């Protein structure tokens, strides 16, 4: 996944998502070639699902009120930051092995 996904989000939403990721609010992360699923803990626990095509998000869903109107939310951004961080960690780990 490249960094182009960040263009899907308003700057302040992206920053809030980064904070949620940094604060370890993303849990139960499942990442496959075609889909990402996770829970994000904030004021409540929200479910996020992201469909992928060629490693890029093509459809995103979150059950928070903000995303209910079709907006991209901080929970979606947090999950994508978490996937990016996990892939970076695994890549660095494989280089060391």
What are these regions (language model features)?
Residues 1-97:
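Long, low-complexity, compositionally biased intrinsically disordered regions
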């Amino acid at each position: 996944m490249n960094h182009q996904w960040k263009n899907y989000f308003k700057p302040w939403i992206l920053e809030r998502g980064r904070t949620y990721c940094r604060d370890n609010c993303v849990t139960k992360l499942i990442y496959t070639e075609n889909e990402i699923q996770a829970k994000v803990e904030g004021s409540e626990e929200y479910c996020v699902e992201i469909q992928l095509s060629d490693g890029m998000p093509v459809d995103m869903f979150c059950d928070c009120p903000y995303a209910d109107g079709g907006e991209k939310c901080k929970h979606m951004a947090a999950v994508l930051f978490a996937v990016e961080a996990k892939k970076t960690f695994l890549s660095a780990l494989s280089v060391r092995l």
